[in-house]
Amino acid sequence: MSTLIECGASPFIPGFALKDVRLENGLTVRVAIGGSGSPLVLLHGHPQNHTTWRKVAPTLAQNHTVILPDLRGYGDSDKPTSDPAHRTYSKRTMAQDIVMLMDALGFSRFAFVGHDRGGRVGHRLALDYPDRVTCCTFIDIAPTATMYALTDKSFATRYFWWFFLIQPFPLPETMIAHDPAFFLRKHISGQLKIEGATSQEAFNEYLRCYQNPEMIHAICEDYRAAATIDLDDDAADTSARIRCPLQLLWGGLGTVGQLYNVVGTWKEKALN
């Protein structure tokens, strides 16, 4: 049985209300909801939370019921203790969270947009729950297995955190916790191609969450899962294809667009 607690208006996104939704699996997810119409879920990446969508959510809410969850381990959602196999933060587990969230909100089918980590959750979501997803968009990602398989010096240098965060506990946790603001600032500045794209207000919100040791550990577990159990799950589903219409977006100056054939790699994973 899921439960829902109203948490007031969003201080970052006009017209959106905050809710804490306790899912059937016991996890509590913080979510911002606004607008009306067909349901559209926006899944954020690392190191952000749902507020990363603050500039586009109000416009999308003119035609959709827009649902902005904090992924498990991120923002103000629960950060459960992980397991040795990292299954707690596998994309399969995180995708199940989203389906349970939509069940709790009363939506049987929905579209979603996933950026970065959210896109990887979305990939598994589209594979495991094809009857629930009407269409989907991935922003700035190639398939996880492809990116690992084609890793070279350029990718490893630009995406250093992929290899730092997967180191055994407590190495990355200890180093990040020593100065979360420094790590977060360097991480974000290394990704930005447009100066000022992340405002000071947004940075402060991300830092508020990043200063929580439980979130630091959860983020590391998210990446550890990506390098282990997620690859195992993908290998077991090599013949599976995304059945719903898939839209791909990426930045022309970004690493993914420069290093990978984005459309070509996803054509191998999707039917549409």
Locate each region found by the language model.
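Active-site glycine-rich loops that stabilize anionic/oxyanionic intermediates
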Residues: 37, 45-48
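Flexible "cap/lid" subdomain of the alpha/beta-hydrolase fold that forms the substrate-access gate
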Residues: 2-20, 25-29, 36-39, 52, ...
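Structural cue for short, hydrophobic secondary-structure segments
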Residues: 42-45, 68
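Short amphipathic alpha-helix adjacent to the substrate-entry channel of hydrolases
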Residues: 51-68
